Structure formats: structure tokens, C-alpha cells
Amino acid sequence: MVQGPTTHRNLDDSPAGPLLILSPCAGTPTRVPAAPDAPDFRLPCHFGRPTRKRGPSTPPLSSPGKVCATGPRRVYSVTVCCGHCGKDLTFAVKTGSTTLLGFEHLLNSDLDLLCPRCESRERHGKR
């Protein structure tokens, strides 16, 4: 389900299904922003601070502005809540519209994202 811009409505504690709001950012910057100011979509998961890759750096898969098979790639701000504690977190993704709908399906079906606190608890066997 794709909806329009973010609203400030209060939803009940047990919605019928996950809320997903998708919208592209105003421009397509050359680097992915930290995403607090961008329009967003919401899902029932949470993501922590991006981790740094170790080892040699790899070049980007596509050049900025390149059109992929699913259409032009745009930057989307994603707001999700933790699959364990429900805290909100916002992060950015850059993708085409078809891939974004596949990402939505994955998050709605089989993927629970965890906040750093819950991830640490899961890793150390605390619940």
C-alpha cells in the first residue's frame, strides 16, 4: 500500500495492519542523507546506526542519476519501529519504485528489524 505525504494523525494501539507511507525526497542528492528531514514511509520495525564496512572499500554499484531497470532511482526516508520494543527510527534508502515495493513486501512478511538495544540483548541472550 502506497500513500501520500506524512500526516500527524494519531493511530490506535492495534492497527489492522502495518502502516507504510512511501514518498521520494525533494531532490536526488549524490550521497544518501541521514534522512531526518525527508518524507518517509513507516513500517513495524526499527534500524540502528549504519555499520561501517571493514576491509577494502567498494565502488558504488551505479553512478548518481543512473536509470535502473525499475525506473529512476530516488532517495526515500524510511521510518520503522523495532520488531521487539516498538521504538521508531528513520534511515534512508536509494532505489527504484519497483524495488521499493519489493522491500515493502519483505518488511511486511518475513523481516523484523531491531533497534541497537534489542539487537544487543538478542546477541547476548537477554530478553
Curated annotation (Swiss-Prot):
The sequence motif named Nuclear export signal is recorded at 100-108
Alphabetical UniProt keywords: Activator, DNA-binding, Early protein, G1/S host cell cycle checkpoint dysregulation by virus, Host cytoplasm, Host nucleus, Host-virus interaction, Inhibition of host innate immune response by virus, Inhibition of host interferon signaling pathway by virus, Interferon antiviral system evasion, Metal-binding, Modulation of host cell cycle by virus, Oncogene, Transcription, Transcription regulation, Viral immunoevasion, Zinc, Zinc-finger
Q: Name one GO molecular function term.
A: DNA-binding transcription factor activity
Summarize the PTM comment.
Highly phosphorylated.
Q: Where in the cell is it found?
A: Host cytoplasm; Host nucleus
- Please name the InterPro entries in this protein's record: Papilloma_E7
Gene3D superfamilies given in the database record? 3.30.160.330
Task: Mark the unnamed zinc finger spans by residue number.
Answer: 82-118
Give the start-end ranges of region E7 terminal domain.
2-56
The transmembrane segments are: none
Q: Which GO terms describe its biological process?
A: DNA-templated transcription; symbiont-mediated perturbation of host cell cycle G1/S transition checkpoint; symbiont-mediated suppression of host innate immune response; symbiont-mediated suppression of host type I interferon-mediated signaling pathway
Q: Which Pfam families match?
A: E7
Metal-binding keyword on record: yes
Stretches for region Disordered: 33-66
Q: Its domain of life? A: Viruses
SUPFAM superfamilies (alphabetical): E7 C-terminal domain-like (SSF161234)
The Gene Ontology CC terms held by the record are: host cell cytoplasm; host cell nucleus
To which protein family does this belong? Belongs to the papillomaviridae E7 protein family.
Q: How does it assemble?
A: Homodimer. Homooligomer. Interacts with host RB1; this interaction induces dissociation of RB1-E2F1 complex thereby disrupting RB1 activity. Interacts with host EP300; this interaction represses EP300 transcriptional activity. Interacts with protein E2; this interaction inhibits E7 oncogenic activity. Interacts with host TMEM173/STING; this interaction impairs the ability of TMEM173/STING to sense cytosolic DNA and promote the production of type I interferon (IFN-alpha and IFN-beta).
Swiss-Prot/TrEMBL domain comment: The E7 terminal domain is an intrinsically disordered domain, whose flexibility and conformational transitions confer target adaptability to the oncoprotein. It allows adaptation to a variety of protein targets and exposes the PEST degradation sequence that regulates its turnover in the cell.
What is the role of this chain? Plays a role in viral genome replication by driving entry of quiescent cells into the cell cycle. Stimulation of progression from G1 to S phase allows the virus to efficiently use the cellular DNA replicating machinery to achieve viral genome replication. E7 protein has both transforming and trans-activating activities. Induces the disassembly of the E2F1 transcription factor from RB1, with subsequent transcriptional activation of E2F1-regulated S-phase genes. Interferes with host histone deacetylation mediated by HDAC1 and HDAC2, leading to transcription activation.
Task: Please report the name of this protein according to its UniProt entry.
Answer: Protein E7
Q: Which organism is it from?
A: Bos taurus papillomavirus 2 (Bovine papillomavirus 2)
